[in-house]
């Protein structure tokens, strides 16, 4: 078992001024919790911002409120907002393996987290989180297998959606 902070760096989001939130897409998108899973944002930020909070396509993000989702971001230039963090795998850690391991760990944390209105994931909890991390060659194999399975599942979901649409079109 290894602590999360020993296998990756964690960058926590910035507290952007909500007065500068806009729906004008000429500004950079602002990643909020609800955007993590879907990979895009319809909220933009018109103010000044620190450059270190600009994301790239493929960055690994975690939503820290409600459902604790982990997903890859899908576009360049978005801004990392508070209550969302970015995981950057350290040398010796396969980032896809990290994504799969964190998916399981986050669901377990979510399951055991008490809440009144919305569940919150703290930086303290992430910093002490421990994951089972095999050597890099095994991480690579596990990540490759799970990625292939994930693609098959996604393809099957698309097929089911097409069949569902076909049935609806007939009636």
Predicted regions and their residues:
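Short, solvent-exposed loop/turn positions at domain surfaces
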Residues: 48-49, 115, 154
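Histidine kinase transmitter module recognition
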Residues: 90, 101, 152-155, 159
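Short amphipathic alpha-helical signal-transduction/dimerization elements
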Residues: 102-110, 150
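A short glycine-rich beta-alpha junction/loop motif
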Residues: 2, 12, 78-85, 115-137
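Short amphipathic beta-strand starts and helix->beta connectors
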Residues: 71, 112-115
